[in-house]
Amino acid sequence: MSNTSNGKANKGSKMQMQRITAKKNQHILNEILSDKLIWLAPIEEDNYREYQLNNAEIIKILGLPKGIFKGFWPSRQPQWDGIAISEKKVLYLFEAKSHLSEIQSSKSKKQELIRMRIDEVANEIAGIKPGDDCKRNLWYHNYYQIANRIVFKEKMQGLAEISTVYKKVVLVFLNFVNDTSWKDSKKMVKSSTEWEEHYLRIFKEMGVDKDSLQSRNIYIKYFDVENLV
């Protein structure tokens, strides 16, 4: 999501994420994920702040040593829409969307270090080789946000071996249905099927499929905001 400021949101996926993580609604994702989540962010007590995983406080909470990300990624990392730890020692990372165009990323030039990390994961998950510039560019640019979230999920899973807090990582792309907060009603996604078809097309272009992602604990979930209180 593009709006990364702190504070209570009044529209879009940022607002819906704040609503679904509110105490009165926390049972919803617990039921969807069959787990009990303890939210690190966004929470009202912390002014709904969103965090990068290299934040010193987050690193400490996750039981990881300082400097663990040195040389892995530039200091400006992805900022997560939601971070939670569960009673089962699972680290949950959330990327939230409430309209289709939020998935598309800019085509800005990426640093060599970023491209290298994406290449590693794209090769491992999708079998994309260095010479396949067409598919690689989709990971670098068009679907960069999806790509970098997958990269960090894999990184955090590797770090689970040394964490004292979590042993497994789950990445959730959480997509909201019937978000009427958008002034442009054309942006509103009216069914989970619409989201499903959109993701299936994207995954096909990226050279991955839903089943292979789920085998790596990467899930696409949908929720109708009309069911929030």
What are these regions (language model features)?
Residues 18-22, 72-75, 138-146:
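Aromatic-acidic/polar surface patches that form glycan- and anion
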Residues 55-61, 102-106, 181-183:
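Short acidic/His/Gly/Ser-rich catalytic and metal-binding motifs that mark active-site loops
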Residues 1-62:
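A structured, charge-rich N-terminal accessory region that forms the first stable segment of a protein
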Residues 77-81, 89-93, 141-143, 168:
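Extracellular structured ligand-interaction cores
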Residues 98-175:
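Catalytic cores of nucleic-acid endonucleases
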Residues 82-84, 90-98, 149:
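Conserved catalytic cores of phosphodiester-cleaving nucleases, focusing on short active-site segments
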Residues 53-87:
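Active-site metal-binding core of divalent-cation-utilizing nuclease and nuclease-like domains
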Residues 147-229:
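Non-catalytic C-terminal interaction segments of nucleic acid-processing enzymes
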